[in-house]
Amino acid sequence: MSSQRQLPAASGTVEIVLLDGGGFRTTEDWRLHEGGHSRPFFLYDWCFFIQHKASGRKILWDLGISKDRSLYTPSVLANQWVGANPVGPRIPLTEQLKAIGHDPAEIDTVIFSHAHWDHCRPLRSEFPNASALFGPGTIPYCRPGHIQNLEPTMASQWDSRFFSDDENVRTESCSELDGHWAPWGPFDAAMDYFGDCSFWIIQAPGHMPGNLAACVRHPSGEHILLGSDCCHSRAIFDGRSQIAVSGPDSTKLCLHLDLDAALETIEKLREAVNSYGMHLALAHDPEFIREVY
């Protein structure tokens, strides 16, 4: 008899497709892993297309990186772009979608796991009919963003095109997820987004306010957990490496705003995998491809 815990009965499924969101040509493994190296390596930045089987609705989970620098704030370009050395996908997201038979204009929602620039950017030019959704607490934390007195500034990394209170500045249709949150599996707060247990959005504290994970139910019946930046590598997830809390010169750093909460979230991800049989896909790690694909 299987010792795995059971999830509530589900009637729905979704199609999920891995999309190339670009990545980073960087030397800063030490930002991810305590005692990490400074050798050049490529850090992936995955995003996902999700289509609800019953309704036909098409959504995206994160957007990865764009080659268009105008989609980023001056603070991001000055403070994060150089060290990260980002590169966009080999094929733009819109063309990737067309290649699998989907019109970008049919995307009605982009759900951002969180508001960091390598996951989130203005979307109107690529997905004209899509609205953006963020986790609870994101908008007040990021408000008002980088534009002050109608001029871009270095004051904030957050993008006023999403977060400004001024309707003349805010160009993107966005809101926070608003609905019923309830315990599901090992998680304290999850939302049954389509109402048939095919796609759960999960509050995942630690990385930044409003941080999210998600879980999709594949037509095979398997569950794929989208861990995004809850955990930055499989090595950390497996306990082979620790989250970086200091740099090469012993300066304090951490990619998670609340490390204790992030560690609790990672433990819940482990429980989801080990006790509920879910498959884990992290935003910046390729190891899941061998398992899922």
Which residues fall in each region the model found?
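Active-site metal-binding loops of divalent metal-dependent hydrolases
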Residues: 21-22, 63-65, 115, 138, ...
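A short helix->loop->beta-strand "cap" motif at the edges of active sites that frequently abuts
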Residues: 57, 127-131, 277-278
